[in-house]
Design a protein with these regions (language model features):
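Metal-dependent amide/peptide-bond hydrolase catalytic core
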Residues: 1-4, 11, 46, 74, ...
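Acidic/histidine-rich catalytic neighborhood of metal-dependent amide-processing enzymes
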Residues: 124, 132-205, 255, 415
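Acidic/His- and Gly-rich active-site-bordering loop/insert found
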Residues: 1-124, 153
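Acidic-glycine-rich active-site phosphate/pyrophosphate-binding loop
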Residues: 104-119, 198-209, 347-348, 379
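Short, conserved micro-motifs enriched in small and acidic residues
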Residues: 122-137, 150-152, 221-227, 394-401
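Residue-level recognition of well-ordered beta-strand positions that form the cores
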Residues: 83, 96-98, 162, 205-211, ...
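Residue-level signal for inorganic ion chemistry
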Residues: 23, 27, 44, 190, ...
Length: 417
């Protein structure tokens, strides 16, 4: 069977690549996913899958402890699920992908049209090509391969095409699981370079407000410059970032991301006129943390760092910085590497590809984390990508073929295990 699968995919890979081109050309920036979901619905219909369209229910998902509010209304934004029923009582499997992408702007940084789907050599280019439309289509093509070959699959296979992973996954993967679409195993084909990801860091966003006092630039001595006051906080957070990068280590993250934790200061807003002393400065940051660290202790660490940095400043003593937490707030995810689901996947992938699969973790989040709330097993495995979220994003097509082969074989092995 392994050779039949390999031959089918090799002989039909142009259809696989063409389908990836089709979806890359759909501008499915987070919040505007429905054109892409209509396309995926048609692809699932081609396989005669049992279709479910899931429009997230805010009241339901927002009550879940893992929910992240994207701030984007759920109306007319559906998740598409296609189910292939097993012929017996074999193990069930979800293969997951998200249709949403981040904006490609600024366009001037690209050397080509971000929505072109152009193929140059072994690489297919475009926003979302790697993250993660190639994986999404590999999922579909792996199941299509087995259906076209007429192989009876023992357990149910669910294909999940979801929205808003880039914004936290609350209305996407979480909404599907909350509606009861839970299986024995869960694979997300994120572009993780043919490595198997079983863990990711916790993530939290924070915002700091610093108050100043406005004045005319010609009388700046009468004002309090909020930017200058914010610089003390910036410096302290930079020092914290450097210290954590050197001292906080988690082996799986070191393998997968090259550094276990990051503290990124991503947004700084201050002032509205060059001749006015700025009266307010606002800083937004993202801090990552490893399994074993908790949200509560990381919050305290950030808050203590900020407040200590302004000690002794007469203005800041009377007008202390205000700290708030918003957006992403997730605990770390860690899948037991000794679980049979994981061990069988590695065994299968190494057998199909003919080389060792490295088990890694990632500093960035993904939808597989939601499985831990349902007592199920999850992992990520996907193609080789470059420049995700950046200009000239691309995916390596030979790795897409590898992923599709691995998935098709694993569907059989897992369902019969």
């Amino acid at each position: 069977l392994k050779e039949k699968i390999r031959l089918y995919i090799e002989e039909n890979k142009e259809e696989l690549f063409k389908t990836i081109q089709d979806v890359v050309r759909i501008k499915s920036v987070v919040g505007n996913e429905q054109e892409m979901q209509l396309y995926m619905k048609k692809k699932y219909e081609e396989l005669n899958l049992i279709l479910h369209e899931i429009e997230p229910k805010y009241e339901k998902v927002s009550a879940h402890e893992a929910f992240i509010d994207s701030g984007i209304p759920f109306e007319d934004r559906k998740n598409i699920i296609g189910i292939h029923k097993g012929v017996s009582n074999g193990k069930s499997l979800t293969i997951h992908g998200h249709v949403d992408v981040v904006s490609p702007e600024p366009y001037s940084n690209w050397t080509m049209d971000p929505w072109s789907g152009d193929i140059i050599g072994n690489k297919l280019y475009g926003r979302g090509s790697a993250d993660m439309k190639a994986g999404l289509i590999s999922n579909w093509f792996a199941l299509k391969t087995l259906i076209d070959l007429g192989y009876p699959i023992a357990g149910d296979v669910q294909l999940h095409s979801v929205i808003e992973e880039e914004a936290g996954g609350g209305g996407g993967a979480l909404a599907c699981l909350e509606e009861g679409f839970v299986t024995d195993g869960y694979i997300s084909t994120e572009p993780h370079n043919l490595n198997m990801t079983i863990s990711h860091g916790g993530i939290m966003y924070f915002r700091v407000y610093v108050k100043g006092r406005t004045a005319h630039a010609g009388l700046a001595h009468e004002g309090i410059n909020a930017i200058s006051k914010m610089m003390k906080i910036l410096s302290a957070l930079d020092e914290l970032s450097e210290w954590r990068a050197k001292n906080v280590k988690f082996d799986l993250f070191e393998k997968g991301s090259g550094q276990s934790v990051h503290l990124n200061l991503g947004v700084l807003k201050a002032g509205d006129w060059v001749s006015t002393v700025p009266g307010e400065a606002i800083l937004e940051g993202r801090i990552g943390f490893i399994p074993g660290e908790t949200r509560e202790e990381i919050k305290q660490l950030v808050q203590d760092t900020i407040m200590k940095s302004v000690l002794g400043d007469e203005w800041m003593d009377k007008n202390p910085p205000v700290i708030e937490w918003f957006g992403w707030s997730t605990e770390p995810w860690y899948q037991d590497p000794e679980n049979p689901f994981v061990k069988l996947f590695i065994e299968n992938a190494e057998d199909v590809m003919g080389h060792k699969v490295i088990m890694v973790g990632r500093a960035g989040g993904n939808d597989a984390r939601f499985t831990q709330y349902y007592g199920k097993q999850g992992l990520c495995f996907g193609p080789i990508g470059e420049n995700m979220h950046g200009p000239d994003e691309c995916v390596h097509l030979d790795s897409v073929v590898e992923v599709t082969n691995v998935l098709a074989n694993y569907i059989i092995k897992w369902s019969e295990s």
